[in-house]
Design a protein with these regions (language model features):
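C-terminal engagement/docking regions of AAA+ P-loop ATPases
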Residues: 2-21, 259-345
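Pre-Walker A (pre-P-loop) alpha-helix and adjacent loop at the N terminus of AAA/AAA+ ATPase modules
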Residues: 23-70
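Conserved alpha-helical scaffold flanking the Walker A/P-loop in AAA+ ATPase domains
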Residues: 51-54, 107-129
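Walker A/P-loop
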Residues: 56-94, 107
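Walker B catalytic acidic pair
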Residues: 66, 131-132, 143
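P-loop (Walker A) phosphate-binding loop of NTP-binding proteins
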Residues: 67, 101, 171
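Canonical AAA+ ATPase core
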Residues: 108-113, 136, 140, 148-238, ...
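AAA+ P-loop NTPase domains with strong preference for DNA replication initiators
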Residues: 210-299
Length: 345
């Protein structure tokens, strides 16, 4: 997955052609239809849905953190149906091997004799749900993460290009649960967002029980196609963003790094490792997608603030002192938003 590179001045405005304008209008109108379709099977989780859509339209990948039984699989599968994308679910287990993900070569008899034939694994799809990715050892985790980065896999020295669009949503159980293999920081950094999926409020949970015990869920109707998603990738990158907002994203990211010049005192006290440059890139790119989804052709500081938590929470590593004092990543992100001055303030 190539990283976005923001130009130093004003980007090309969005909707520069009639075709672009029509695509933007379809995207804006389609968001309401997406919510309507998902409401047939999913109750609540609006913030989770918004963040997944932003990542999908930005060309990024998502890590979803939450306890089992929160309808993560149903949500991802439903989104794949809405966009008419080929969907595959990979259940990560301690004995899962890299070839179980990428595919393997087998010896097959043909009219010309025996030949090695590559049998594609489940990674050859448009939308992958990597379920409980932290249940499998690092070697197998790396097989999927390599495919995420390169959009290709290699078997017996032969490269096999993955289908586009290629979007991975990996779920993980909270790291304090038994039998987990935490993802290394360098691999976590490949995910655009870490989306927190929490238990529903009582009223929404009551609605889930009523809905799932009274009737069969409605059928999800496709709204967009894979070609539409690729077009939206281009449109998102055309959304203009002011340089002072880019600087705000960069300063917010840099402030998370301990022992740096502009690091607040609480970062030096509580953080072992801060966010890298990729965080700033994803903040700006995600802000562009959020603006476009809301019908705006410009980015605001609120877009960046709203996405700070999903972008930063898996890129900041707290130290033992923070744990002893009961401080977590969410607390640090909130403090960063208070400490870093917004543009024009």
């Amino acid at each position: 997955m190539s990283l976005p590179t923001e130009p130093p001045s004003t980007p090309t405005p969005v909707s520069s052609t009639q075709a672009d304008r029509e695509a933007v209008e379809r995207l804006i109108a389609g968001r309401a239809r997406i919510e309507t379709e998902l409401a047939k099977v999913i109750v609540g989780q609006k913030e989770v849905i918004e963040q997944i859509l932003i990542a999908l339209f930005s060309g990024g990948h998502c890590l979803i953190t939450g306890a089992p039984g929160l309808a993560k699989t149903l949500l991802v599968k439903s989104i794949a149906q809405i966009f008419h994308l080929k969907f595959q679910r990979i259940q990560f287990t301690p004995d899962l091997m890299p070839a179980d993900i990428t595919g393997t070569e087998i010896l097959q008899d043909t009219g010309e004799g025996r030949k090695m034939l590559f049998v594609r694994g489940p990674v050859f799809a448009n939308m992958i749900l990597a379920d409980e990715i932290n249940r499998t050892p690092p070697k197998t985790q790396a097989a999927l993460l390599e495919a995420m980065q390169e959009h290709q896999v290699t078997a017996a020295g032969v490269r096999h290009v993955l289908e586009e669009p290629f979007f991975v949503l990996a779920t993980q159980n909270p790291i304090e649960m038994e039998g987990t293999y935490p993802l290394p920081e360098a691999q976590l950094d490949r995910f655009m967002f870490n989306v927190m999926m929490n238990y529903l409020p009582e009223d929404e949970e009551v609605a889930v029980v009523q809905q799932t015990t009274a009737r069969r869920p409605g059928k999800i109707e496709p709204i967009f196609t894979g070609e539409d998603v690729l077009r939206f990738h281009d449109l998102v990158r055309q959304v203009p963003v002011a340089e002072n907002l880019i600087r705000y994203a960069v300063r917010l990211t840099a402030a998370s790094r301990p022992q740096q010049t502009n690091a607040p005192a609480f970062v030096n006290d509580w953080v072992s490792w801060g966010a890298g440059t990729r965080a700033g890139q994803f903040l700006v790119l995600g802000a562009k997608a959020r603006a476009l989804l809301q019908g705006r052709t410009h980015v605001s500081a609120d877009d960046i603030r709203t996405l700070a938590a999903p972008v930063l929470r898996h890129r900041i590593l707290v130290n033992y002192r923070a744990e002893a004092e009961g401080k977590n990543v969410e607390t640090i992100v909130l403090r960063l938003l208070e400490a870093v001055q917004e543009p024009g303030v």
